[in-house]
Amino acid sequence: MRSNLLLPEIIMLASFLMGLVGGQRAMTPLAAVAIAAARDELPADNGAPKLLSHPVVAAGALALAIGEMAGDKQKTAPDRIVAIGLAARFVTSAIAGASLVPRRQRWIGAAVGGLTAVAASYPGWRARMAAMSQYGQTPTGFVEDAVVLGGAAAIARNAAKLGAA
């Protein structure tokens, strides 16, 4: 039997993990929760903005995530730690973090998701730079994409289970 004392921490785990994803790809957390919202797969009484569940919003977020992943392989792609990149990671991961927790905890979930994304950007950037020097930009980008996509999908898919814990 699970203790109710740990329930808030378990629920915030999804926001934290999605923030880790957001530190690597800004648009993936938003796309993951928008798709989950459109499929009605988010936890009951979640903190997601209602507009997020609209199929057009989900499709748009997915298109932006795909565009970001394609652009990341370009030599001219900016580092994730530039100011606009950090701001985008904070905002999209905050929306995702709020969407993965009960409505009454949405502000905490937003803070956890957004702040984690900004913090995770730096070690993610350093790891990518180190890997790129050995393996190149495109191969390391594809590996990072696979990890990010798998993580985001697993988090969004299991958030409802965490909320029902």
What residues fall within each predicted segment?
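Short amphipathic, positively biased membrane-proximal segments
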Residues: 1-165
